[in-house]
């Protein structure tokens, strides 16, 4: 499918749930690779004024949060289940990774995710 719409949760901090949802339109799932999509996200972070506070964070990992028409998790920032949904192969196209139109993804720093996964405490409450 061409022209997919994807929502990406750009996560700066897990504990304080500092995140911003960013919508990307017209993404060609059949030809866009994971690494290319990360570059598209990084470019948006660097140019969109609403994402200014995210520019100093090192983002390196994409993970599927939820596929279209499926149940969301209780954690509104990240899906702590399904570590197999982390998109490790940057050369794979998005469609080969199981991404469909209206899939929601999380974009974050892997080291911060692993630390939060080991101790999932929310400090913003």
From Swiss-Prot:
It comes from the Eukaryota. This is UPF0538 protein C2C4.04c. Signal peptide: none annotated. Belongs to the UPF0538 family. One of its GO terms (cellular component) is nucleus. InterPro entries: UPF0538 (IPR018794). It comes from Schizosaccharomyces pombe (strain 972 / ATCC 24843). GO terms for biological process: 'de novo' protein folding.
């Amino acid at each position: 499918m061409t022209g997919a719409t994807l929502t990406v949760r750009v996560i700066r901090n897990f504990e304080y749930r500092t995140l911003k949802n960013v919508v990307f339109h017209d993404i060609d799932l059949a030809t866009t690779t994971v690494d290319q999509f990360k570059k598209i996200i990084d470019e948006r972070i660097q140019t969109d004024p609403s994402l200014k506070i995210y520019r100093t964070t090192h983002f390196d990992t994409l993970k599927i949060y939820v596929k279209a028409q499926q149940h969301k998790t209780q954690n509104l920032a990240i899906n702590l289940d399904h570590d197999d949904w982390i998109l490790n192969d940057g050369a794979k196209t998005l469609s080969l990774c199981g991404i469909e139109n209206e899939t929601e993804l999380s974009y974050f720093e892997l080291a911060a995710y692993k630390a939060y996964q080991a101790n999932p405490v929310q400090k913003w409450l």
